[in-house]
Amino acid sequence: MKHKGAILIVIGVVALAAMILIIGPGEIEDALRKADPVYVLMAVVLEFIILALFTLRWSITTRAVSIDVGKRHLFPMLLVGMAINNLTPSARGGGEPVRAYMLGKYSRASMESAFATVIADRGLDTFPFIFLAVLTIIGIVLYFDLSRWILAALIASVVIIVVAFFLALYVSVDRDAGERITGWILGVVKRFYRKNHERLERRVRSALHEFQSTMRMMLKEKNVLVYGIPISFLIWILEIIRVYLIFTAFGTDISLLVIAEVFILATLIGMIPLLPGGLGAVDGIMIVFYSYAGVSPSVSAAATVVERLISFWMISAMGVAAIPYFGSSVSEKLMDKL
């Protein structure tokens, strides 16, 4: 792991530790001891079901472009990508090129086609995100007494993400739009890269055309949307239920709507490329808002610790452990990303 990444993880852990100290380690420990292990185990099992659904959704996009790779091989690629997202300050996007790289290496598909399947897979998440984001904004107005500035910032961030998604989708499938964006980027590159820029331009335009062709092929494949969108909604619903099970383990009754609201807020915070996986910041947001919703601070902190152990640390550990699966040459490159 690079020194910068390790330092940022330490900073995130220290921030979380500071919040635990403020709340009271003894109270949090008491809450953890009272947790029902059956519900915690159910939350862990549910996380594996969620991972299986993620793998299934990605396999739909790979099949749409005739990339022949089994789910048992996609699964470790998914885990490694998630680990990269969690352990690097990359706005939860650093793992996607890694997934594409591994898919291309394993299936011998072009990098452009492999990357298109990853982009489409992540894009399917946008539909439930928009729905839950609207619910979150409504819920915050009704349940939380936040300043107008915070509410405006939340609305603005959601709008920016939605606009960016549809703009990226437009550029991905429209040849003229892609050419204009590519031309602008190449114009900037030419100022600094004067050697063989004609060759570079040919390679970039060729890669763009293949990427766009693959994206259009997937959008024409009805299974991508017919099955991909419902699976995406199911994944988000199950993630909310997972958090609900954890609170149930602590004997706390909490609204699923409140969990959804905090989940969206935590997702937005996690996208800020400051700390790996929003470590510290996401935990803090979850603890503060659950407490604000009426859950005791000690239970909020204990539930957040358990939730992050399952959804962050367990997944990260599994992803790192899966890296040797792809051989030494790939492993060395992947470890450089951490």
Curated annotation (Swiss-Prot):
UniProt entry keywords in alphabetical sequence: Cell membrane, Membrane, Transmembrane, Transmembrane helix
Family: Belongs to the UPF0104 family.
Annotated source species: Methanothermobacter thermautotrophicus (strain ATCC 29096 / DSM 1053 / JCM 10044 / NBRC 100330 / Delta H) (Methanobacterium thermoautotrophicum)
NCBIfam families on file: flippase-like domain
Keyword Protein biosynthesis attached: no
Membrane topology label: Multi-pass membrane protein
Subcellular location: Cell membrane
Lineage: Archaea, Methanobacteriati, Methanobacteriota, Methanomada group, Methanobacteria
Transmembrane segments: 6-26, 36-56, 124-144, 149-169, 231-251, 254-274, 275-295, 310-330
PANTHER family referenced in this protein's UniProt entry, alphabetically: UPF0104 MEMBRANE PROTEIN MJ1595
Record protein name field: UPF0104 membrane protein MTH_1261
Phosphoprotein listed as a keyword: no
GO CC annotation: plasma membrane
